């Protein structure tokens, strides 16, 4: 059970890692390329041997673990915006897992794999492709997630596409979290164990 909870917490950190970047880009209009690449790469790992295979960049994942500590810990500085994005992603994931869009999602991700023969994962064309997958396959499943931020940045096409690409990454981690048995009630009843794992992971 302990190993499963470790893996589940890793996937949950993956969700928050992506959501944290969404918030940063919406507010500041820029992104850290390494963190962006780390999140986008998780979308491409569709048949992992282990959860760890999905998150090759452990340094980037630390940002997700830190958000777990911030959001689930005893601090009064919980970020309601991060919580709102998380609730939206988990709601869309439920609809995805219950519908028949998984096949289309896999097909579209294969197109990105082919595209990467010619471009890097943070290239504009690739990000636009990820964004298109989110718009066409995920966003249509339920209510759109309303992103808050600086209106000057939010109206820029490149910012919009990075945000959608990162929401797709958050969705990928949400699917994995659910596959590992993740349920929203665990965030309440297993909160201390999840926090312990997150804190331990930050010191490794």
Curated annotation (Swiss-Prot):
* Name recorded for this polypeptide: High frequency lysogenization protein HflD homolog
Spans traversing the lipid bilayer? none
- Tell me which NCBIfam families the record gives: PRK00218.1-2, PRK00218.1-4
Q: How does it sit in the membrane?
A: Peripheral membrane protein
Q: Which organism is it from?
A: Shewanella woodyi (strain ATCC 51908 / MS32)
Entries under Pfam families matching the protein: DUF489
**Record keywords: Cell inner membrane included?**
yes
Per the record, the major location class is cytoplasm
Q: Which family does it belong to?
A: Belongs to the HflD family.
Q: Name one GO cellular component term.
A: cytoplasm
Keywords per UniProt: Cell inner membrane, Cell membrane, Cytoplasm, Membrane
Q: Does the keyword Ribosomal protein apply?
A: no
Q: Where in the cell is it found?
A: Cytoplasm; Cell inner membrane
Q: Which SUPFAM superfamilies match?
A: YcfC-like
């Amino acid at each position: 059970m302990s190993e499963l909870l470790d893996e589940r917490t890793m996937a949950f950190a993956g969700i928050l890692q992506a959501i944290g970047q969404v918030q940063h880009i919406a507010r500041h209009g820029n992104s850290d390329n390494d963190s962006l690449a780390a999140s986008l790469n998780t979308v491409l790992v569709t048949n992992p041997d282990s959860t760890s295979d999905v998150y090759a960049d452990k340094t980037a994942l630390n940002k997700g673990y830190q958000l777990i500590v911030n959001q689930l810990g005893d601090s009064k500085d919980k970020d309601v915006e991060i919580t709102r994005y998380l609730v939206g992603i988990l709601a869309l994931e439920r609809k995805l897992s219950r519908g028949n869009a998984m096949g289309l999602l896999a097909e579209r991700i294969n197109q990105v794999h082919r595209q990467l023969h010619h471009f890097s994962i943070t290239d504009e064309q690739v990000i636009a492709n990820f964004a298109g997958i989110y718009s066409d396959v995920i966003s249509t499943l339920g209510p759109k997630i309303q992103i808050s931020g600086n209106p000057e940045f939010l109206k820029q096409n490149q910012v919009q596409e990075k945000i959608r690409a990162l929401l797709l990454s958050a969705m990928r981690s949400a699917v994995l979290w659910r596959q590992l048995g993740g349920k929203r009630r665990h965030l309440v009843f297993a909160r201390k164990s999840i926090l312990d794992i997150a804190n331990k992971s930050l010191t490794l």
